[in-house]
């Protein structure tokens, strides 16, 4: 399915930002700081294009509290588009309970007549070349989330952890044992091609996985269908302009 002009423009804008970062920092291209920040910019591009996260800001630094990227997630845009193409069941509990925490699924807000307030997104990036994500990294992410978000506001946020590699079994178990909405996204690192970085054919979102809490929190919002059928490629000009701003249950969604 061909990508529409607005979506192309948004991707072009992000690629220009990445190229600018590369040109301004090529002298330190071998450093871990360079690779880490480049990966963060790549994750920003994929979150904006593939999940419509807006107002994305790379904030990694000494005083970031362990959070590398912040943004706003208008899940209602995904829901409206997915609902036009799929039967998103309206059967879901008034309240869900996971690991001792009770909460209302987001779908309740989507079905109400009140304007939907985008979810706050906090992202941690682990630009590991080969290492998989273990329980240790998951616990570190939980610590960063807890230090930034009061317990009373946890259902206004989604924590995302991004890495180029897969989760270990231990990492998966720890992730599903948390009482916060945590989404694991596997985004490739940019690959070299003919002496430069291949921005078009690498650095893509490969997998999206919701822990048990996030799965029930985002139940029947259409995110899995959105990614599985690449609805972001067919988004209308109007929907893209509104959202441009800057794996359910135990099943992981393959994006590409």
UniProtKB/Swiss-Prot annotation:
Compartments it resides in: Mitochondrion
Name of the protein in question: Required for respiratory growth protein 7, mitochondrial
Record's GO cellular component terms: mitochondrion
GO molecular function, one term: nucleic acid binding
Chief place of localization: mitochondrion
Organism: Lachancea thermotolerans (strain ATCC 56472 / CBS 6340 / NRRL Y-8284)
Superkingdom, natural source: Eukaryota
Gene3D superfamilies referenced in this protein's UniProt entry, alphabetically: 3.40.1350.10
Family: Belongs to the RRG7 family.
Keywords, comma-separated and alphabetical: Mitochondrion
InterPro entries according to UniProt: RRG7, tRNA_endonuc-like_dom_sf
